[in-house]
Swiss-Prot record:
<feature type="transmembrane region" description="Helical">
    <location>
        <begin position="166"/>
        <end position="186"/>
    </location>
</feature>
<keyword id="KW-1133">Transmembrane helix</keyword>
<dbReference type="GO" id="GO:0015079">
    <property type="term" value="F:potassium ion transmembrane transporter activity"/>
</dbReference>
<dbReference type="InterPro" id="IPR023051">
    <property type="entry name" value="Kup"/>
</dbReference>
<keyword id="KW-0630">Potassium</keyword>
<feature type="transmembrane region" description="Helical">
    <location>
        <begin position="287"/>
        <end position="307"/>
    </location>
</feature>
<feature type="transmembrane region" description="Helical">
    <location>
        <begin position="397"/>
        <end position="417"/>
    </location>
</feature>
<feature type="transmembrane region" description="Helical">
    <location>
        <begin position="212"/>
        <end position="232"/>
    </location>
</feature>
<keyword id="KW-0813">Transport</keyword>
<protein>
    <recommendedName>
        <fullName>Probable potassium transport system protein Kup 1</fullName>
    </recommendedName>
</protein>
<feature type="transmembrane region" description="Helical">
    <location>
        <begin position="46"/>
        <end position="66"/>
    </location>
</feature>
<keyword id="KW-0997">Cell inner membrane</keyword>
<keyword id="KW-0472">Membrane</keyword>
<keyword id="KW-0406">Ion transport</keyword>
<dbReference type="InterPro" id="IPR003855">
    <property type="entry name" value="K+_transporter"/>
</dbReference>
<dbReference type="GO" id="GO:0015293">
    <property type="term" value="F:symporter activity"/>
</dbReference>
<feature type="transmembrane region" description="Helical">
    <location>
        <begin position="418"/>
        <end position="438"/>
    </location>
</feature>
Amino acid sequence: MDQHKGDASLGGIVKALGLVFGDIGTSPIYTLTVIFTLTQPTRENVFGILSLVFWTMTILVTMEYAWLAMSLGRKGQGGEIVLREIIMKLVKTGRLVAFAGFLSFVGVSLLLGDGVITPAISILSAVEGLLLIPGLEGLSTGTLVAIAAAIAIGLFSVQFKGTDRVAGAFGPIMAVWFSTLAVTGVVSALSMPEIVEAINPWHAFTFFRENGLAGYFVLSEVILCSTGGEALYADMGHLGRRPIVKSWYFVFMALYLNYLGQGVFAITHPEAKNLLFGMVRDQMPTLYIPFLILTIMATIIASQSIISGVFSIVYQGITTRLLPLMRVDYTSREIKSQIYLGAVNWSLMVAVILVMLLFRKSENLAAAYGMAVTGSMTITGIMMIIVFAHTTKKWRALVALVITLIDAAYLLSTFSKIPHGAYWSLILASIPFVTIIIWTRGQRSLYHALKPLDLETFLISYEQIYAKGPIRGTGLFFTRDTDVVPPYVVHCIIRSNIIYERNVFISLVITDEPLGVETELIKGIGPGLDAFRIEAGYMEVVDIEALLKANGIQEKVIFYGVEDISTRNPLWRVFSVFKKLTPNFVQFHKLPASRLQGVVTRVEM
């Protein structure tokens, strides 16, 4: 399994801070504050919670993602779709492949649903820091929500311009943010040096023993310290493994030092409503406003990384045929992976603002937050067990099993959040999940309903018609495979006698590798008939027109099929609506409109 190590220099590490760690890096704004609204901040409880935070970040982020998951890259790429492709290549059993496919569908859906709640809670929690500024204590909840919504609208409104111009500043800003977290945490912790003893897992066991079942359900809030940990693996393709892992060591230290400082502040100021903001204002009141500005910038960067991550996941889903085609715009001439999906962007913005309006406070959002990410972690763990069980490193499957059981324990604890709004995570995740199921099954059913003709049978009639005299020029026909002929091609050539001097069947095959483009021109499969096969990785941006020119194919007209679906099945009706509302293949690949000719085929499903 190929691993791209990446740039582990200081520049690469700083860049990773801005691109990967925004989500987990803003967790200190709300994590302990939420926990200690539910749990009394006694000395024993604080030590127990801080112990749980340390071991949660160690096991679920460092071990699960930085160590295990990031060893399973493919050409440097990571994520649950990558794990699915690895399993499909390793495993031959149909049921296990189907199970892995289903898990990846659920995992991707949970991550997309999480992409709504994360920007909402990050921005809202930062804006709530305004309440600690003298003179602004009386700001209403509605005003705070309006400010947070305005920031979100501004962020989503500039996505179409791309982020490459300002992305260079993300890393340095986040470096300042993490350094500030570390320094403020140390300053607070110095007043109670024994707080470092919280690392001892015995404090966590004592907390469970003293609090019983209530202590177990606190895990549903403790997990907030690790939300965003999955980004280490998902974003591996952008930077490589080494800079992300090295950055994580610094981020881990900065985060935990801040949590220790907040723990001390919670013990000495049990009445505090927001631990991070209260601690910083107590330490340096004159610098509180600059810190608040830095906090808002950090949450904007965190939200930007989530938005970019959602774009990337959806693009992977499109290219692997899990999701319908959507219009994709490329926001950078130099970096093809920087993309903008308008439909996703505006849908995400509406959902984020809706969530802000529904929950109104970050503590309310925190009550709904965590189920999706723990579900995703558990699914990643199960998929890693399958992968490692089919490799020579079978002992890692045992380690992955232990971690997955811990994931499952956290996931089970989050079920206590369902009455408090966690069902919104499930509702949000169900939208992409249902879309994936309908789209994948619909495509399969449509392909069978079309009843393509095998090439040998097609060639018998084709050769007879070609002998009568073809039209001058070159005609291109898109097919799923060069060995079978779709009905629209049969209609064009056999029934309508539209045949050119040179006819080329073009097929685009998505491989199970993330990157790489290969082409093969097969000449003479019939008189005046060639086949052009493109094999591309599922993360590649394929310029079909450029590939045609590079292989000397100058088309006069490009034919493609348009299916007119007739059905009584309600699922296939939804599938038909998806087909009508989304771009078709040639529109997605931006082929020249003046040369396109759609051929309608009526299909009974």
